[in-house]
A protein has these predicted regions:
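General marker for long, soluble alpha-helical cores
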Residues: 1-303
Length: 303
């Protein structure tokens, strides 16, 4: 009878809704006369029913979330607020993610909304996987929503045992070589090889190895084995804080000759005096040092 009357939707909802608002009977009545979920929600909201009560009623009535979410969005809440409301009404995080995505919310916005609703990372990842994202897109969303390379690596390595492939996807998604190296850890030669495989620059490789815990004395040998130029090895060790004497010693032990060390030093703005002292400290033969400095292009101070 009310449906056939000329009353507004809100007026009908007010008549059907008891006080304090308990909209379950109203939901049944309004649905029986063919109202869509969006119309029911708008009417009950206008009648003063709180959203949490309405949504709990919808959930109990097995309302399809794909229809409820657009109605909720049309009501004006933010994605974060809507996610909290839907989760509070006992819908699962995966269902909420799919509903928000179905309402044209971008995957990263879906992730932010779920995070704001305190969805834990394992459940968040499962929810994003329910959106049928590729592994690359999933990692990009996690990167863009503030998750570190270490936690992404930890969470995804079980599903992608190919370390090189997962590392490549991390780099493609915006993670830096140092962050990736810290996440991977593992044996130093294997880590160095992975960094080269994912196309980290030579200096990036050296710095990343050092930041990931590889002793500086090993880095020169690892970089040489990868085919890195002497100047890049000096630069990486210098950026890691190694003094010239330590750099020269590491390079001598990695079978670089005096000419290589001197040239690497000059190309990285180490003075002739510093280079000479460093090479002497590293026990290069004294008679080789002047010739090596000359080979590297250092000017002699002798008249």
């Amino acid at each position: 009878l009310l449906h056939k009357s000329h009353l507004s939707d809100v007026a009908i909802a007010k008549v059907l809704t008891p006080a304090p608002p308990q909209p379950s009977p109203s939901v049944d009545a309004l649905r029986e006369v063919g109202w869509e979920w969006k119309r029911v929600l708008a009417a009950l909201r206008g009648a003063g029913s709180p959203l949490p009560v309405i949504l709990s009623s919808f959930q109990l009535k097995h309302a399809p979330l794909a229809q409820v979410a657009p109605a909720l969005i049309a009501d004006g809440g933010t994605p974060e607020e809507n996610a909290k409301l839907l989760l509070g009404a006992k819908w699962k995080a995966e269902e909420v993610a799919q509903a928000l995505r179905g309402a044209d919310l971008a995957p990263d916005m879906v992730a932010r909304a779920l995070q704001a609703a305190n969805v834990k990372r394992p459940e968040l990842i499962a929810s994003l996987r329910a959106l049928k994202l590729s592994e690359a897109d999933l990692i990009t969303v996690l990167h863009d929503t503030g998750h570190g390379a270490d936690v992404v690596w930890s969470d995804l390595k079980a599903s992608d045992p190919d370390a090189n492939n997962l590392a490549r996807l991390l780099k493609k998604s915006g993670y830096g070589c140092t962050d990736i190296a810290k996440a991977i850890k593992g044996k130093h030669p294997e880590l160095a090889a992975t960094l080269k495989t994912i196309k980290c620059e030579p200096v990036e490789i050296g710095v990343a190895l050092g930041q990931a815990g590889t002793p500086r004395r090993e880095i020169a040998a690892l970089m040489k084995e990868l085919g890195c130029d002497r100047s890049f090895i000096v630069r990486a060790l210098k950026q890691l804080g190694a003094p010239p004497s330590e750099i020269a010693d590491a390079m001598r032990k990695s079978q670089f000759n005096a000419d290589d060390v001197a040239l690497g030093m000059r190309l990285n703005s180490v003075s002739a005096d510093e280079a000479s002292r460093a090479m002497a400290s590293a026990k290069f033969p004294k008679d080789q040092i002047p010739a090596a400095l000359a080979y590297a292009g250092y000017r002699s101070n002798k008249p």
